[in-house]
């Protein structure tokens, strides 16, 4: 009965999110789209099904929070640009009597000190800008193979004199078959409201519907992941009609194949012994959106990294290429406060 009720609430929330779709970039709190954990970053930037997920991956899918994350703390750092940094920290605890795992996560994006000017370009001074969110995640297991969870996020954003607050909810579901070493994942992200707007009118949140699968080969130390992002929207082409009136920089209309494959994110892990994992990923949409016409695209859309697994410490690193001359680095440390048997 509880599971059926959970599914009913889940789909009601999903369809509520489907009713609030906006042009990419025109919604509020778009920093919620960013992935600030290097494990997901190295896998292409989206993954909701990885069954060896670190605690930081809970920001991708709340149902990835497991009992194994008990007493784990994680700190993540992302360098997006010379003056833009992203920080994400999380901690988890398993409530044995309630068979429930809970986690607290904090996100902070700082955009540095910016110049404040008037309409004529005269410098008036400087201001600071940042985005923040505080999330509480709850996850449980059902019938040994099903995991379900949700994250409630409080959002705070300030750009100088302009401030905004919001409330968002993520819900997730996983099916894990340990014998076949395969996991399927589902997440509906950023469903909520803007409580206080920057100006007079309120904006929608950047809703996303993500599906994924991760499979480990039986006779080779390799895991593959296939993830579909923004599955509620068929055509992901950024088509700003107001901007296109100038016909400057307008890309050709996407064909059917491009529309389909733009949803996909591919990822792979190579297990080097028991302590080292090499990771690579490819984000089709990122390569399409950020390529520069008539110029070589290079590694745009590709990402890679590694993680080092020690007894109580895990270290993750990722590098993501946005354009030939632009990439960002991510690093994360996860520490288990209690050893097994403590």
Which stretches of residues belong to each language-model region?
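Positively charged n-region of N-terminal signal peptides that target proteins for export
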Residues: 1-5, 144
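Short linear sequence motifs
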Residues: 4, 8, 22-24
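Bacterial N-terminal signal peptides
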Residues: 6-17
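Subset of outer-membrane beta-barrel
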Residues: 21-342
């Amino acid at each position: 009965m509880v599971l059926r009720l959970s599914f009913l609430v889940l789909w009601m929330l999903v369809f509520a999110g489907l009713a609030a779709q906006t042009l990419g970039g025109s919604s509020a709190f778009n920093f919620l789209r960013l992935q600030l954990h290097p494990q997901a970053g190295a896998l292409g930037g989206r993954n909701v099904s990885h069954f060896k997920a670190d605690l930081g991956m809970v920001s991708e899918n709340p149902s990835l929070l497991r009992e194994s994350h008990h007493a784990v703390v994680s700190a993540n750092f992302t360098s997006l640009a010379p003056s833009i940094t992203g920080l994400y920290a999380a901690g988890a605890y398993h409530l044995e009597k309630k068979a429930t795992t809970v986690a607290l996560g904090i996100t902070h994006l700082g955009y540095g000190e910016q110049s404040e000017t008037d309409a004529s370009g005269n410098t008036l001074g400087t201001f600071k800008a940042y985005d923040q969110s505080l999330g509480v995640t709850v996850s449980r297991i059902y019938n040994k193979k099903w995991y379900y969870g949700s994250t409630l996020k409080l959002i705070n954003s300030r750009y100088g004199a302009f401030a905004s607050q919001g409330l968002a909810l993520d819900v997730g579901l996983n099916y894990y078959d340990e014998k076949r070493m395969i996991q399927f994942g589902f997440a509906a992200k950023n469903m909520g409201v803007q409580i206080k707007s920057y100006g007079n009118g309120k904006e929608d949140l950047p809703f996303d519907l993500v599906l994924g699968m991760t499979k480990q080969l039986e006779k080779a130390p390799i895991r593959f992941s296939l993830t579909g992002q923004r599955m509620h929207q068929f055509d992901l082409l950024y088509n700003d009609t107001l901007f296109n009136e100038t016909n400057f920089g307008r890309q050709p209309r996407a064909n059917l194949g491009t529309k389909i494959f733009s949803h996909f994110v591919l990822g792979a892990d190579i297990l080097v012994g028991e302590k080292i994992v090499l990771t690579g990923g490819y984000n089709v949409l990122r390569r399409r959106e950020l390529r520069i016409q008539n110029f070589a695209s290079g590694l745009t859309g590709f990402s890679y990294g590694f993680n080092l697994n020690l007894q109580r410490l895990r270290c993750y690193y990722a590098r993501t290429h946005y354009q030939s001359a632009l990439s960002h680095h991510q690093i994360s440390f996860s520490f288990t406060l209690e050893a097994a048997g403590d």
